[in-house]
């Protein structure tokens, strides 16, 4: 049987005017700033007006460690949101925006897949409502003001060798990773080494996604450390007096974007921080607003549960004062087989033994998620090659680990295919059995926070930190940053720092290479291994196959 591509399905969508989607959740047309007919921003005045309403229930969708076989986390998030509406619940979806760089790099973009998508897909994967351009502009303004400050006398006494603030562009461009700036003579400033990151790696992006309102946004921007003096004391963004103008540039970008699913259900698509050097979740303002408008809000966190879900619980929930009622962990038969040692080319053949062998990775994630005091449901994202025996093997394993697995066919059937999963989510959520708590307190020393995650989530024997790292953490504690959560930056492919070590390894250690203070965002980044903040394009980038056809439609985006 031939299946339609995601783009073919998206183009056949019977979209409703965005004002109708807003009315479904109580947003009047006067409180929407339309961008065309099918997307709009929600006004700050409306957001302020609903703050006294009670919260709905929050559902987090996460997954096992990602494999090349693909797990379908966003697809499941969208499918579950549609499924909840299908069974009569008032539900919303909250996901991240797409970055241009990856869309033109490894593969085209998407917002879900099959019959579980958010539309307009093409717009969302290109310029959308301009949020990323605004973030890039605000970041670039600060870059320009730092060098301008140095040029006109350097009142803040910035050590030009210790400028921390790199430039950004929303593109994969390895040639810009390390550059020399201000060449060409005295009129162009003081030459120094610099570099570019991709926009989603910017601390401005992380701040926009954690700020509660514009006032909080401006304060956080001012708190960013941009450089150091010769005495190693920090220079803040507020010392350069850039935070006010940056806030002006970000004023509209702070407003959540309202779009719809293929089944005309409401979705907020807002923000998109990296899931390694930042927290990998959509914006706090979108999530908290959705909780005031819907009975159920379905959101996701980047990569596997050891990265995205851990940061969602320990960083986003802590900062925003929210808590999930239930967590859905997405797994696939294909991924279990790959964890069980089957090559990608052989995943289509039935192999129940390999499924069983690969299940401990899923079991580890279930145990970790439960340690936050939240009930866990496993969603088996169905692929057409799955057999009944393979699905039963996963269900049996999950049952032995004190959870329940539900087969979901949303990719193929839309909300009808996810109705069983939706019913199970409602059944569990309405028991109100969640007793959520982060796995470490604010006042725990920073080094102990790192050790706690390494031992309890990664099941390592220890995190290896040399004297330089420990001294830096102690210094930040003395400077008043000891209460901050830690944001672990490591490979997403394994519980360990070795991307090839699959399954549920124990007895390993987590080497900490460096630590970085994101004072504005409000967390300490703990770098374990190499961190790529500016990706490169592959040998054959997807951009080579993206073009307009004779009808002016985009081809090759997905």
Curated annotation (Swiss-Prot):
Class in the EC hierarchy, top level: ligase
GO terms, molecular function: ATP binding; formate-tetrahydrofolate ligase activity
Keyword ATP-binding: yes
Source taxon at top rank: Bacteria
UniProt keyword annotation of Transferase present: no
GO BP annotation list: tetrahydrofolate interconversion
Keywords: ATP-binding, Ligase, Nucleotide-binding, One-carbon metabolism
Residues where ATP binds: 67-74
Reaction catalyzed: (6S)-5,6,7,8-tetrahydrofolate + formate + ATP = (6R)-10-formyltetrahydrofolate + ADP + phosphate
Recorded metabolic or biological pathway in which this protein acts: One-carbon metabolism; tetrahydrofolate interconversion
SUPFAM superfamilies noted in UniProt: P-loop containing nucleoside triphosphate hydrolases
Xref: InterPro entries: Formate_THF_ligase (IPR000559), Formate_THF_ligase_CS (IPR020628), P-loop_NTPase (IPR027417)
EC number, as in UniProt: 6.3.4.3
Family recorded in the similarity comment: Belongs to the formate--tetrahydrofolate ligase family.
Name used for this protein in its record: Formate--tetrahydrofolate ligase
């Amino acid at each position: 049987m031939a299946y339609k591509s995601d783009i073919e399905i998206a183009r056949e969508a019977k979209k409703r005017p965005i004002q109708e989607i807003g009315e479904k959740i109580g947003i009047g047309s006067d409180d929407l700033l339309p961008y065309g007919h099918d997307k709009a921003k929600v006004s700050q005045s409306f957001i302020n007006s609903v703050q006294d309403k009670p919260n709905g229930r929050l559902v987090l969708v996460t997954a096992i460690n990602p494999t090349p076989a693909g797990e379908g986390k966003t697809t499941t998030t969208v499918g579950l949101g549609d499924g909840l509406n299908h069974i009569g619940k008032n539900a919303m979806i909250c996901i991240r925006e797409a970055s241009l760089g990856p869309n033109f790099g490894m593969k085209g973009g998407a917002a879900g897949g099959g019959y579980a998508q958010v539309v307009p897909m093409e717009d969302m994967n290109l310029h959308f409502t301009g949020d990323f351009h605004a973030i890039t502009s605000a970041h670039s303004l600060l870059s320009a003001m730092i060098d301008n400050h140095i040029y006109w006398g350097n009142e803040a006494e910035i050590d030009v060798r210790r400028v921390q603030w790199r430039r950004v562009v929303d593109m994969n461009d390895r040639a810009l990773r390390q550059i020399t700036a201000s060449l060409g003579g005295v009129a162009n400033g003081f030459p120094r080494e610099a570099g570019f990151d991709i926009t989603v790696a910017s601390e401005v992006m992380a701040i926009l996604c954690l700020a509660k309102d514009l006032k909080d946004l401006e304060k956080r921007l001012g708190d960013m450390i941009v450089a150091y003096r010769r005495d190693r004391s920090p220079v803040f963004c507020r010392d350069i007096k850039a935070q006010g103008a940056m806030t002006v540039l970000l004023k509209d970008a702070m407003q959540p974007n309202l779009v719809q699913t293929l089944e005309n259900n409401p979705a907020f698509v807002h923000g998109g921080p990296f899931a390694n050097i930042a927290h990998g979740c959509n914006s706090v303002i979108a999530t908290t607003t959705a909780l005031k408008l819907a009975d159920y809000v379905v959101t996701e966190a980047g990569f596997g549960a050891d990265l995205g879900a851990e940061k969602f619980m320990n960083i986003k929930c802590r900062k925003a004062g929210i808590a999930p009622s239930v967590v859905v962990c997405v797994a696939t038969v294909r991924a279990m087989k790959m964890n069980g040692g089957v090559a990608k080319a052989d995943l289509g053949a039935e192999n129940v033994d390999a499924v069983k062998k690969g299940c401990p990775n899923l079991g580890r994630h279930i145990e970790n998620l439960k340690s936050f005091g939240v009930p866990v449901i496993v969603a088996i994202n169905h692929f057409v090659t799955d057999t009944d025996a393979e699905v039963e093997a996963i269900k049996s394993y999950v049952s032995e680990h004190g959870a329940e697995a539900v087969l979901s066919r949303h990719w193929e059937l839309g909300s009808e295919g996810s109705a069983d999963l939706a019913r199970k989510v409602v059944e569990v959520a309405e028991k109100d059995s969640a007793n959520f708590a982060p796995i470490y307190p604010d006042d725990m020393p920073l080094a102990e926070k790192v050790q706690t995650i390494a031992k309890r989530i990664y099941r390592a024997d220890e995190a290896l930190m040399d004297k330089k790292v420990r001294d830096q953490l102690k210094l930040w504690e003395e400077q008043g940053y000891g209460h901050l959560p830690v944001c672990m930056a490591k490979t997403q492919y394994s519980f360990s720092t070795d991307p090839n070590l699959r399954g549920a390894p124990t007895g390993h250690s987590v080497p900490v290479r460096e630590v970085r203070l994101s004072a504005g965002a409000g967390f300490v980044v703990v770098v374990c291994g190499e961190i790529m903040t500016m990706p490169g394009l592959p040998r054959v980038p997807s951009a080579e196959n993206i073009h307009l056809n004779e009808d002016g439609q985009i081809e090759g985006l997905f």
